[in-house]
Amino acid sequence: MFTIYAPDLTPLGLIENYRSMQWTRRYSKAGQFELHLPMNNLLVPENIVRNGNEAAVIESVTITSTMEGGIMAAVRGRFLTSYLDRRIIWGLMAMSDTAENIMRSIVTNNLRGLPLTVAEPLGYTGTIDYQNSYGNVLAEIAAIAEMSELGIAVGFDRVFRVYKGLDRTASQSSNPRAVFSRNFENVLGSEYAVEMLNHKNVVLVGGQGEGVDRMLITVGNETGLNRRETFVDARDIGNGTAEEPISVATQHAMLAVRGQQTLAELKVSESF
């Protein structure tokens, strides 16, 4: 059973009769859902589907008629984290801080009317140098989160949170292990897919300058046949002003972060 809400969180009704539901969580980006059910007037774009403490916004509705004369709807959308896809970084943003604080600052400084708040920091460590102009807010924080192995989420309470998942693999002993097996009767079948079509592991990042004077750094050290190269134009990472110049070392660090973000987005894709 799912509750449907208006964009202002006014409850509109319940969905109890549906044919199928896929509710897909994502760690470092917005999750998505797909719902197939008989059509009703609650299923319109921008309405919100609540599933416990999680919620998603309806972004697509496809209506079809059946041979039996019924009307079915395929409803798709993304979790409320996707609201951040509606904003860009408005101007220049340059910070040297933890990945957590940088993501929180990107969101806080670019809400511009979005009905979201930002949770207090949890103190995750690891400082990075970051600079961007006019990037998409969701794309930027997703890249930082993936590079830093952090999760991002916006629940039904419309609070943006940065979190870190628990390692439940068999190779560790700190947390209870999660084991899926037919022997435990907690899985009926399985599917594994690996995709390397867009995979890159070495990136040449270009900063300020022209020709032989352009600032260039390389991120990644693969060699031979395993080496997969790409280029990123990072001219938006500047050298500051005459009054407040950015050191060459800091520019290199910012370019390195941009390269790490790129490689995080282009890593080998595995799904289970």
Residue ranges, per PLM feature:
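A structural detector for beta-sheet-dominated domains
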Residues: Y5-P7, T24, H36-P38, G52, ...
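A residue-level signal for beta-strand positions that form part of recognition/binding surfaces
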Residues: M1, Q32, A55, M72-A74, ...
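Surface-exposed cap/loop segments at beta↔alpha junctions
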Residues: L37-L122
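Polar/acidic, low-complexity leader/linker segments enriched in S/T/G and N/D
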Residues: M1-E16
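Short beta-strand-centered interaction patches in the first periplasmic/extracellular domains
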Residues: I63-L84, E120-K200
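An acidic/polar, Gly/Ser/Thr-rich interaction patch typically located in mid-to-C-terminal regions
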Residues: L14-N41, L150, E185-F272
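Short, surface-exposed beta-strand/loop "edge" segments at domain boundaries and coil↔beta transitions
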Residues: T10-G13, N41-P45, A55-V57, S82-R86, ...
